[in-house]
Amino acid sequence: ALPSEFWKAGSMKERIYVCHTYYHVYVTFLKELKLRREQKDCGEATLVLSRLSNDFEQLDERIRKTGLFAEIISFDEKRDDFFPELKKYREDHGNIVFNMINRMIFTRKYARLEEAYVPVDFREYGDIYVFCDSDPVGYYLNQKKIPYHAVEDGLNCIKNFDAARFENRGHFGLKAWLSRELNLIFVQNGYGKYCLDMEVNDISAIKYPCPQYIEVPRQPMVDALSGEDKQLILNAFIRNREELERQIEEGNRIGKKILILTDPL
């Protein structure tokens, strides 16, 4: 983060969060509410909702009504297969030298093509938080040399699946070095050159922790929520809250119930 004096000069906006799932948005609420409790003069934040893997429907409208964020912006993020000119650079030639050269070209071209769909100037923000920087935004920020904070995609997700190591298996150390030190390719989850750090829930649970990992447990943020905080979150996430509460009240008079929660991801 930049010094607080910089904010007072009005030179930059404070924070921006890039979310790809409802869970990302939930953790963003936890982080932002915690910050508001601890720093009364922390300023306002911007929330970016990527449509890459989720249809957020009217979530942005409900969040806007809470007043927690200064802006809610939709991001029409594009996967690499949206750009047919990138296909040839993803082919496996069976040779690490040829593959790495193609990957270097792919990394630069992908970031350049993605730029047309980026809805915000990230350079205007002092702190950028990105959930799942393996998505196109990670390529974009690193190629544009814009520092950012990565945030663990799910709860202890790297413990169960270390995507960076799996997707870069075979000469991982070399690939991590090409990404972290030279920015010639991009490796997610803390190995990008412009990734300042990556927040994870529990470092001790991760078999191969990256030096950039910092531990930010999520349960204490949940435990610290006030009644008012919880109501704000409910108002943001529940689409037909009054109708749902009415159904629950009616169900209480009938007897035992089962609530089934599903997640498309």
Predicted regions and their residues:
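A nucleotide-sugar donor-handling region in carbohydrate enzymes
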Residues: 152-154, 159-259
